[in-house]
């Protein structure tokens, strides 16, 4: 990709509050400083809605990673942590996969994980993770709301946090899509 902005031009947020796990994404697809689409779907549910995933980066690369993750999840009997580690190893070592320009967040009832092409599988603290150009805005808002707004649900926190990120990040929009683990 010739433009580093295209790699990070989105916001993906995943959080767990009580027993509710939710992932949210904005709908904007940008290339450089141009908005190409405002209603993109960057999320997927896997394993009969037991696992949720979202990507930031190249669309084709993100979709390829979704497919690879689904295969790993089937191979490892829906064990998300093992599947994520195996995907990260392949992503880092495979000549083709190594060139993929994307990041992922995946989650289930036990884990929220960030996966990168460097082979990283990071389980963030505080049950909240975010990636993309608006990720730090969404992460900050979600952590603050989780600390001080005990009456909000995970879905309400995700929506408020994503809207704050969309207000601040020009590469994210207010067309928020969410998925839950069931």
From Swiss-Prot:
This is ATP-dependent protease subunit HslV. InterPro entries: ATP-dep_Prtase_HsIV_su, Ntn_hydrolases_N, Proteasome_sua/b, Proteasome_suB-type. Transmembrane segments: none annotated. It comes from the Bacteria. The active site is at 10. Disulfide bonds: none annotated. Na(+) binds at residues 166, 169, 172. HAMAP family: HslV. One of its GO terms (molecular function) is threonine-type endopeptidase activity. Gene3D superfamilies: Glutamine Phosphoribosylpyrophosphate, subunit 1, domain 1. It catalyses: ATP-dependent cleavage of peptide bonds with broad specificity. It is found in: Cytoplasm. One of its GO terms (cellular component) is proteasome core complex. Allosterically activated by HslU binding. GO terms for biological process: proteolysis involved in protein catabolic process. A double ring-shaped homohexamer of HslV is capped on each side by a ring-shaped HslU homohexamer. The assembly of the HslU/HslV complex is dependent on binding of ATP.
């Amino acid at each position: 990709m010739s433009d580093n902005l295209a790699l990070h031009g989105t916001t993906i947020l995943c959080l767990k509050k009580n027993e509710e796990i939710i992932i949210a994404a904005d709908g904007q697809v940008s290339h450089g400083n141009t908005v190409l689409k405002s209603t993109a779907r960057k999320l997927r549910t896997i394993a009969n809605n037991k696992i949720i995933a979202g990507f930031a980066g190249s669309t084709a690369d993100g979709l390829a990673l979704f497919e690879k993750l689904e295969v790993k999840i089937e191979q490892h009997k829906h064990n998300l942590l093992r599947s994520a580690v195996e995907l990260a190893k392949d992503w880092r070592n495979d000549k083709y996969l190594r060139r993929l320009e994307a990041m992922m967040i995946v989650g289930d009832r036990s884990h929220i994980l960030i996966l990168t092409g460097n082979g990283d599988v990071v389980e963030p603290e505080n049950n909240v993770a975010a990636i993309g150009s608006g990720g730090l805005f969404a992460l900050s808002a979600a952590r603050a709301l989780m600390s001080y707004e005990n009456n909000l649900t995970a879905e309400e926190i995700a929506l408020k946090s994503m809207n704050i990120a969309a207000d601040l990040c020009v590469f994210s929009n207010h067309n928020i899509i969410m998925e839950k683990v069931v």
